[in-house]
Amino acid sequence: MFVAALSRPGASVSGAFPWSWCWTWKARNVFLALRERGLLHRQKPCERGSGNASSAHAGMTHGRIGKRVSTKTPTILYTATDEAPALATYSLLPIVETFTKAAGVAVEARDISLSGRILASFPEFLSDAQRVPDALSELGALAKTPGANIIKLPNVSASMPQLIAAIKELQAQGYKLPDYPADAKAPEEKGIKTRYDKIKGSAVNPVLREGNSDRRAPLSVKQYARKHPHSMGAWSKTSKTRISHMDEGDFYGSEKSVTMDAAGFVRIEHIAADGTVTVLKEKTPLLAGEVIDASVMSYRALAAFYAAQIEEARKNKVLVSLHLKATMMKVSDPIMFGCAVEVYYKDLFAKYAALFAELGVDVRNGFGDVEAKIAKLPPEQKAAIEADIKAVYKSQPELAMVNSDKGITNLHVPSDIIIDASMPAAIRTSGQMYGWDGKLYDTNAMIPDRCYAGVYQETVRFCRENGAFDPTTMGSCPNVGLMAQSAEEYGSHDKTFQVPSDGKVRVVDQDGKLVFEHAVEKGDIWRMCQAKDAPIRDWVKLAVTRARATGWPAVFWLDPKRPHDVALIKKAETYLKDHDTSGLTILFKSPEEAARYTLERLKKGENAISVTGNVLRDYLTDLFPILELGTSAKMLSIVPLMNGGGLFETGAGGSAPKHVQQFVEEGYLRWDSLGEFLALAASLEHLAGVTGNKRAKLLADTLDQANARFLESDKSPKRKVGEIDNRGSHFYLALYWADALAQQNDDPELKARFAKLAKVLGDNEAKIVAELAAAQGKPVDIGGYYRPDPAKTEKAMRPSATLNAALLAL
């Protein structure tokens, strides 16, 4: 979602070059460079939709796909994504390319944005000029090769409302995409629905993550947090905030696990009460040593749990809130979310059941779907329903709010409250969430499944007993996470089903032998997960490596009462024998015990490495960084790919839609690109190690120096108009990086080149800052949300003519 103005390649760098908008300084230079390399040919003008407006992502820097990535020039692939990080890339990428070009390193972009993935999935509906390559598939294949060097920015993991909104936006821009067929019946409709469904949820990360996760706060970031502590809400010993979870009928209580003795495959079947057999998934290949497990969530027990906790919140006079991850867990969690909507608004749904069915209300899309559907009714009928909605709010406990001013509740949109962001934010804010009046209140936070709810409960209990953490003294908790090859729950989407009728769900192997079986009722959610042996071995190795490098305790967060974790404990204990662990502290604790152990160490200013599965990797790399650093976006997130390449993720946070909202309304982008700075330094260092490119190593070292100075000088974006924002932070990175290169003596040529840039930027600092500040304080039109207009967005994100000219002059 940034303008790098190169060809939009097809199978052989075919397609239209967007001459109409992108002949900027950067476009010209990079275009000429690619043409010299024989990668680009002049073609017809680009069209956006059926009109002549430019395509928002059409100008992405695309190099060769697969074998087409240059073999002569070391290449870093930089992902074009969504929302705030994508806006930031319009400003940052020209700076990055200015520096890396000097080292003979190519930085090429790949469009894996939500809109880009939609367009790539439906080429037959688009004109030749509108078609885009399947960049995600390209990167997925590349991630399995030793030469992979990918910088991955946060992207939208689309909920159904987000997917529908993106489709409508693209259609309005002239892309003749098919509507999403919610009630697909014909084979063609089913095919379209299947393609769209593959785009939902976390469709990107499982493809790219061909390695396990190493996430930690760099020393410079930790020192910055201690010198410039973020706000932390005070905790009261009388706080009524609690984490509530089910005691039976959940995934945790029904889990069964098996480790495969040999390679083979399994089939998932539903057996109805009358004996009818329906194949849910015909064939799932499995490897020797692979851990598979299956579990079921009772819909009836889930609804009873919600009802009990809503009543508990009413009695205790606290907010009620629901914390799931409907984006990542795109099959199970929207169903669980919809169940909460039906229970909370039970009187409304009972009264209008027939009407809501006629309107096509889908509770999996949240209560916002009700409001959207009734908006089309006659005024009197709509007013009557709205009166009944108000009556629900009077009789039920108050819902936590996403946006009090706009009346957006916790139950409005599934993607608005994501557990790994919402729970740390509440814990940081005295354990409280916002009510209807915009004030903070204690909450009953519902996390239905027991697998990981206890981690948050321990954290709440610890803060209530010991008070809030002090960022100036608290320790650090880096993470080693098992995630390669779609490990565990985050790879379960294609093996998750809502049960069509009472009966059984069973798993049988290729010989017809029973592997698992669960008794089920209609509406229950059944799922199967996998964790392959090679990633588990690599995970254990990475844990030992990090423990040895730091000298800190490494704690495996595994529950001896959970069948899946028992299998992992057995494997981890076996594979630890393959490594020298002398002098290391390596522990195995249940998630609750591990949380307590870690929290106690952090309070004392000590450190502990969390070694976790895929879900806790996700949760903890938000929880602890938000408490330590104020944000998870400042984490160094490295994925050593199992075949030798490197994936460098920018922080651990999301794509910050509220930042985009503020930018559009006020011309101020508060996105912090420090995660990108850190990832780029690590990427350059990896590239230098693989290729022997000394200039890449010099760029990495000087970027590290620039990052440290950037933090020490406190040039990160603030929050309000009139203060430094994302664009200003990029200017200071460029200034400090150029200055570091000008000060070094290892490469006289680079020293001389960047001394000129450093002088120009330094001499014009006040002018550049003024030009950037002048762009703030007024609404910005970027021509779209999921696929904004590149010319408008580039203009908004690069408003300093002086800075642009200085970069061009280099």
Residue ranges and their predicted role:
Residues 6, 32-34, 39-40:
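Leucine-biased recognition of intrinsically disordered, low-complexity hydrophobic segments
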Residues 10, 15, 38, 49-51, ...:
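Residue-identity detector for glycine
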Residues 3, 30, 42, 47, ...:
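Short hydrophobic alpha-helical segments enriched in small aliphatic residues
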Residues 751-759:
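Short, charged, amphipathic alpha-helical segments
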Residues 788-810:
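C-terminal accessory extensions/subdomains outside the catalytic/core fold
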Residues 70-338, 347-570, 575, 579-597, ...:
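Extended, well-ordered protein cores
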Residues 769-786:
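A glycine-biased, small/acidic residue-tolerant capping/turn segment at secondary-structure junctions
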Residues 19-25:
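Tryptophan (W) side chains
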